From Swiss-Prot:
Basic and acidic residues: bias regions: 493-503, 509-528
Gene null: resulting phenotype: Viable and fertile. Post eclosion discolored, short and brittle posterior scutellar bristle macrochaetae; this phenotype is more common in females than in males. Pupal to adult lethal when combined with mutations in BicD.
InterPro entries (alphabetical): Spindly/BICDR_Dynein_Adapter (IPR051149)
Protein name: Bicaudal D-related protein homolog
Similarity comment: Belongs to the BICDR family.
UniProt keyword list: Coiled coil
UniProt region (Disordered), positions on chain: 23-53, 493-528
GO terms under cellular component: cytosol
Source organism of the structure: Drosophila melanogaster
A single GO molecular function term of this UniProt record: cargo adaptor activity
Amino acid sequence: MHKPKLANAITAAAIASSISTKNNNNNSIVGGSSSSSSGGNKSKRPRQFGQYSIGVGTGAGAGGLLRSDDSGFDHLDYSSLIGDSIDLEHYISAMEARRHDQEPDVWAQLQQKESDILLAAELGKALLEKNEELVKQQEKLIEDYSSKIEKLEQEKHVLRQKLAIAEDESDQRVLELQSDLTELKDKLQTQDTAIRQAEKEKTILIDELQHQNTRLTEQIQEAHATELKLSAQIQELKDQYHYRNSSLQEHVNSLESIKTELNLTTGKRQELERRLQIAQEEKESLTSSLEESSDRIHMLERHAREQETKLETTLQALERSQRENNVLSERLGADTNSSTPGRKSLQFEMECDEDDGSYTETGKPNQMFVEARSVYIQLKSLVDSLKVSHDDDSGLNSDISLELESMDNTISSSERHEDGHLAIEFRQGMLSSMSDELTRLLLNLDAGNFKKMLDQTRNLVLEQEDEIKRSHQLIQQLEAKVTVTDVELQNVKEERDQARGDLEDNTDRDELLSKAQTERDAANDRRTKAEVELAKTRVELMQANSQLLESIQQKVELSQQLEQWQMDMHELIDEQMRSKLINNRRAMAAESSAPSPPSSAAANLAKRVTSYKLWSLFQR
């Protein structure tokens, strides 16, 4: 168990000494007149107080054995000690005041001393309690200190572990640094070798540079000699400059005139570009018109193919009717041969009485005659429909239409009966003539259509050729203007070169020279731009020429094809007319002479159909 602190012991000793001093003073004041009993009491009380004070002193002495480590404890109860010391100071000051103001009464003094002793005892008791409390606080601090020591030991252990880890890491780092050091040493050796090699190369290079230096010194000497020569030439040029200085203003004026000419040439070039643009637009329009004409040609070819299909259908119907006609003619020939073997003419039979040729014994018409008449009516209706369609399409081939109308009138005049009903005077050769008429009508219709198409294409080609000629003339004019501008540009270049030579001689007038140089540079830039643009225009003109030549070649080929087609059409029309005349002559001869067999008309029709098919194949 620890002892109380020294400060509390000192305060208790101070209280005891103050009380004893007060008692001594009182004893000295009272003197020796006091009785023995009172002296005994006095001796006892101070002795008791002295014992108490000794006890306190021993406590204080024991408290002096405390360690210096407990100095932190004084800070904890410093405020309480200050309060106790203040109370004791008040008590001591009160005792001293009573000592000075004491009464001469001894019993009062004794009572006062007893009360003081009791007070001192109470103070001692309070001090002991305070000491016990301080001891408890000290034990608590010791426990806290031990816990802190344990924590510090743990931290120390952790730090030792960290130190071991750090030592291992440092060892590894040392090994790595040693390996890096060896690598750096190797690199240093390689660098040393490289430096030695570089020094060798440097020495070689220095030797070469020395040789070059000697050679350059020789060249410098030569250049110095040439410099002297050039200085002499410069002096001569200066003399020439002084001589030509008077004509500098004239050169400036010539430069201004050159500038104006350049502006004019640029304006002309822009005009040429505009015209070239117009020519390109015209070329594009020509190409578009050419495409339109090609589209029209394709459309006409498609229309021709449609007409050809229609013609094939009509020809098939015609062949079918021709076959029926042949069958009927054979049957009629057989009937006439059996009835009148002496006569072989179908026309003679048709001119005979109706009761003999067209009717049987019962009064009914002959079946062969009825079939032949129906075939003839079908062919006539087909011819009439083709004539109507031909009149609706166009008014071409008026001679053919007039001929057909005259034939129709002759036929219609013989078709009326007395009572107004349709009656056909069926004779020999009418079916063959009707089939021939149908073929001629079809051929004439197609010939008229193709003639119209040919005229349209010819007009279109002529218009395109005229446009191409105009564009070609425009291109020739543009080329002539370009050549003129080239000549003008060449003249400007020559004047520019002359002005440049004159300006290079003028070395004194720096401002004028710089101004002329700037103008010259601007003129050079404009000239280069003009040359570039002229080159572009030339290239474009060449392209336009090539395109126009290609288009002209295509037009020429197309015109040749059209001419060939026209010639073929003329030949075909001539052949048709010749065949028509021959057929008419044959028909007239057949009417006047003996009748030919019916198969001859069918063969003639078959020949005409084959010729028409060949013509349609040629059209394709």
